[in-house]
Regions:
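Short, solvent-exposed loop/turn segments enriched in Ser/Thr/Gly
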Residues: 3-9, 100, 112-120
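Surface-exposed binding patches on compact interaction domains or structured appendages
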Residues: 15-104, 112
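Active-site clefts of carbohydrate-active enzymes
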Residues: 376-406
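Aromatic-lined carbohydrate-binding surfaces of glycoside hydrolases
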Residues: 98, 106-108, 118-125, 131-328, ...
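Extracellular glycoside hydrolase catalytic/binding regions
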Residues: 328-342, 346-363, 394-412, 425
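Short edge beta-strand/loop segments characteristic of extracellular beta-sandwich folds
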Residues: 9-13, 105-107
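Catalytic domains of carbohydrate-active enzymes that cleave complex glycans
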Residues: 257-260, 266, 270-339, 416, ...
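Substrate-binding cleft of secreted/luminal carbohydrate-active enzymes
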Residues: 395, 400-446
Length: 539
């Protein structure tokens, strides 16, 4: 379509050792041989990285700091769309052959002229050898609406990039890096920002630290709060990334541990929701936070978020938050990634996000969920679906990138407003070399990669998984446009109704599988056929 983006893939196979490789995308030409306008083709090598699938479970109790990932049982995944130059040492050689994947992205502007176009993708070796492939592009006389109403929510870890590039968190240099790093998220439809209001909201489940953007202090029995980093990050998200809302984690963090400074000492204290200490501490915070947000004009943009917390803890938080309204009597918005359906709880939440399995396993019947979404939408509330570890299809390094597309289509078939996933950029120590996690599937922690530290202006590198996620969001937006045309409304709905749920049988672990869910070969073939069928249906 016009104003669209699509993807293609290729491979270079070399029977003998090569030196550095170079990739060139020739100018795009129309059928008359004239240079086209409004069509951009990017061809980039994919970089192989070491992956480890993990055990796909978190032991309880677990240590605050993650253990090292096991050294063995690793594989390789071409998960980084790296660039047009590939140095010899980055090539992967096996049995005397080099297999080098290529990712091709085609973007069209709103005023690209409909028609058939072509270009050549050329690969050169340092010795002067060259091979090429012809790429044909058909631009349809259809415009993709520029208004992107899809609610994509990929949790961000800005401290990870500050640590990777060794810059001051939220300083000028860091925010310049983050501006480039968040561009793919914004272009894909990212609508939600992520902020921390306590130390390690997820009990340090990543290699990188996630400190609190709000500094908690208690001096002479009185609570004090410093918002410097929170303000710089919030201002950046609202101005540069143009998010609609910012989720603040969390009134009920994993582990229910509150860390703060008291009389010059670092204190770590258990704070069970509803307890006397928890109520005292969070009452002080909420009173301060509401006042601060009103002064900054941000009150309506904030969501106090909770992630997979028990019903009793969420109720305690909701009850306390309601006692600290703004000057107009409005309470802060509250949201949550929830495991089970509870009508009373869901009615109190501005954002509700059940796990994909709740729909797939019919714990929440699809028709009921669609009705809930419609009702909540009329009330101005948001309803999304999230995926996580052990899902098949999944969005991991060892997953077929098409599984990311299926995920978006399946969620759309359920009627949700959007998709949530942990995480966008929770990098490990050396993400351009390996993306391991001791517990989770490789790639679950991030969908984008950093630039090389030696680069003058390091730019983010995305994964094929991210590109297919983005392409599927474009497909969903096209279907939404088609529904507005009477003659296509029923066809669009039938197409979405045809999306089936593919879940495999349980398996504890194994490189190349998606956690507990491993599909048999028939399901894999059927999924591949469905991805192709739905992807072509828009033509």
């Amino acid at each position: 379509w016009q104003g669209d983006r699509g993807n293609a893939a290729a491979e270079v196979i070399l029977d003998e050792k090569a030196e550095d490789l170079e990739l060139i995308a020739d100018p795009v030409m129309n059928e008359k041989g004239n240079l086209s306008e409004g069509i951009e083709v990017r061809a980039e090598f994919q970089k192989w990285i070491s992956t480890y699938t993990g055990s796909n479970w978190i032991p309880e109790p677990r240590s605050y700091r993650l253990p090292e990932a096991p050294k063995g049982d690793k594989s390789y995944s071409a998960d980084v769309i790296y660039g047009s130059q590939m140095e010899r040492e980055k090539l992967l050689e096996k049995n005397g052959r080099i297999i080098q994947p290529i990712w091709i992205t085609v973007s069209t502007t709103q005023d690209a002229k409909p028609g058939l176009y072509s270009t050549k993708i050329r690969v050169r070796t340092e010795q002067g050898g060259e091979q090429s492939l012809k790429l044909k592009i058909r631009v349809l006389d259809l415009k993709l609406d520029q208004d992107n109403e899809y609610y994509l929510n990929l949790w961000q870890y800005p401290y990870a990039s500050a640590a990777y590039y060794q810059v001051e968190p939220f300083g000028r240099e860091h925010l310049q890096i983050m501006k480039r790093q968040m561009r793919p998220y914004m272009e894909a439809g990212g609508k939600i920002g992520t902020a921390s209001i306590v130390e390690e909201p997820w009990y340090h489940q990543t290699w990188c630290d996630y400190p609190s953007m709000v500094r908690w202090k208690r001096e002479n029995g009185k609570w004090q709060f410093e918002y410097g980093e929170f303000d710089r990050w919030t201002g950046f998200l609202l101005k540069e990334v143009k998010v609609s809302y910012i989720e603040c984690y969390s009134v009920v963090p994993w582990g229910n541990v509150l860390r703060y400074r008291e009389d010059g000492k670092e204190i770590e204290k258990q704070a069970e929701p509803g307890s006397e200490f928890w109520t005292e501490a969070w009452s002080a915070f909420l009173q301060s936070f509401v006042q601060h947000l009103e002064e900054k004009g941000w009150f309506d943009r904030m969501i106090l978020a909770m992630d997979e917390r028990p019903k009793e803890e969420m109720e305690a938080a909701l009850n306390l938050i309601a006692t600290f309204p703004d000057r107009h009597g409005n309470s802060l918005k509250v949201g949550g990634a929830v495991v089970h359906y509870n009508k009373e709880m869901w009615d109190r939440l501005f954002t509700v996000t059940p796990h994909l399995s709740a729909l797939a396993n019919e714990e929440i019947p699809q028709e009921l969920f669609r009705e809930i979404v419609r009702r909540r939408r009329q009330e101005g509330k948001l309803t999304s679906i999230y995926s996580m570890i052990h899902d098949y299809p999944g969005i991991f390094s060892m997953s077929d990138p098409g599984e990311a597309a299926w995920t978006i289509w399946y969620i759309e078939s359920c009627g949700a407003d959007g998709f949530l996933k942990w995480a966008y950029d929770a990098w490990c120590k050396d993400p351009l070399e390996e993306n391991v996690h001791c517990y989770f599937e490789a790639g679950d922690m991030f969908l984008v990669y950093p630039g090389e530290r030696r680069e003058k202006e390091p730019d983010v590198r995305v994964s094929p998984r991210f590109r297919m996620l983005e392409e599927a969001i474009h497909d969903v937006r096209k279907l939404c446009q088609m529904k507005k045309v009477p003659e296509y409304e029923k066809k669009a709905e039938q197409l979405l109704d045809s999306v089936r749920c593919f879940y495999g049988k349980g398996k504890s672990n194994g490189v190349g599988t998606a956690g507990f869910m491993e599909a048999d070969e028939q399901i894999k073939r059927e999924l591949a056929e469905e991805v192709e069928q739905i992807g072509r249906a828009h033509v």
